[in-house]
């Protein structure tokens, strides 16, 4: 603890410097290492959505807000795993704009890192979709687990383009604020605990996270297309009721607009905002 900082944590200006250094490290490390870490992040976020679905299945008698709060708290596991284990998650990787704004990396390095991480996250999420499908987990609770996935995924492909962009902005505003606050902590529990409520807030509110959707919507598509007749009988529904769950609708109605929103929410509203406040003057001098 320094004499000019009476608190056992990093103060906001120092947090901004940590974000800058983290951005330089992320953008300059070996691309293959980045890709592997991105795959793990895709898996971690998928694990979090599995936890969310499991926790919210069968909560029909609970008040709406309480059920969503429980699910949101469970989902925070994903970001905690990414931060503590060092995985590269696209939605927090957008914060490397701080390093670019300070002139520490090039536009080319930024673009290559974003693309590498984004597609690594996609690979990790789709691998976990395969694992969950082969596990037969969708039949849990007499098929209600799978029905919860279908209903959640179907809702996500019914936003307008503008709605999806705005929901993406709101989601990554909270995710990047959670990551930014973790830069302040000095202990494992500091970093983990401080991220729970921002993540729980965005999940409970129904905001849209592009990487989480890389698991949830494909999982819904797989269940819709390949679930057994016994599943549909158990849940009292049919594939036709989820006809909007297609790969094309996933890409055009959710993934593209939500990704745009995530970049704006994290890169502009968090990263560049704090760069202007804490680092722009230093960079200018």
Swiss-Prot record:
It is a multi-pass membrane protein. Induction: Part of the focA-pflB operon, which is induced anaerobically. Transcription of the operon is restricted to the exponential phase of growth. Expression is subject to complex transcriptional and post-transcriptional control. The tight coupling between FocA and PflB synthesis ensures adequate substrate delivery to the appropriate formate dehydrogenase (FDH). Disruption phenotype: When both FocA and FocB are missing, an unidentified system can transport formate. Residues 57-64, 136-160, 206-249 are periplasmic. It is found in: Cell inner membrane. Changing residue 91 to A: Increases intracellular formate levels. Cannot export formate, but may import formate poorly in a pH-dependent manner. Causes disassembly into lower oligomeric forms. Reduces intracellular formate levels. Overexpression results in enhanced sensitivity to the toxic formate analog hypophosphite. PANTHER family: FORMATE CHANNEL FOCA-RELATED, FORMATE TRANSPORTER-RELATED. Homopentamer. Interacts directly with the pyruvate formate-lyase PflB. PflB interacts with the cytoplasmically oriented face of FocA and the N-terminal helix of FocA is important for this specific interaction. Also interacts with the ketobutyrate/pyruvate formate-lyase TdcE. This is Formate channel FocA. It comes from Escherichia coli (strain K12).
């Amino acid at each position: 603890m320094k004499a000019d900082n009476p608190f056992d944590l990093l103060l906001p200006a120092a947090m901004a410097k940590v974000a800058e250094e983290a951005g330089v490290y992320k953008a300059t490390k070996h691309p293959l290492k980045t890709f592997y870490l991105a795959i793990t992040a895709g898996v971690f976020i998928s694990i979090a959505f599995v936890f969310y679905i499991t926790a919210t299945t069968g909560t029909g008698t609970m008040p709406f807000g309480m059920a969503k709060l429980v699910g949101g708290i469970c989902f925070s596991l994903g970001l905690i795993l990414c931060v503590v284990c060092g995985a590269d998650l696209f939605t927090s990787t957008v914060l490397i704009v701080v390093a670019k704004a300070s002139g520490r990396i090039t536009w080319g390095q930024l673009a290559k890192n974003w693309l590498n991480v984004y597609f690594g996250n996609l690979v990790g999420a789709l691998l976990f979709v395969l694992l969950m499908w082969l596990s037969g987990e969708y039949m849990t609770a007499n098929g209600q687990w799978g029905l919860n996935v279908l209903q959640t995924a179907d809702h996500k492909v019914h936003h307008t383009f503008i709605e999806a962009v705005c929901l993406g902005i709101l989601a990554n505003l909270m995710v990047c604020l959670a990551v930014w606050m973790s830069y302040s902590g000095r202990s494992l529990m500091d970093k983990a605990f401080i991220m729970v409520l921002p993540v729980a807030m965005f999940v409970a509110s129904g905001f849209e996270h592009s990487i989480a959707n890389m698991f949830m919507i494909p999982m819904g598509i797989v269940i819709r297309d390949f679930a057994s007749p016994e599943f549909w009988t158990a849940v009292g529904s049919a594939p036709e009721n989820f006809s909007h769950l297609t790969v094309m609708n996933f890409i055009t109605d959710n993934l593209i607009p939500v990704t745009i929103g995530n970049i704006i929410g994290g890169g502009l509203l968090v990263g560049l905002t704090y760069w202007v406040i804490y680092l722009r003057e230093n960079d200018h001098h």
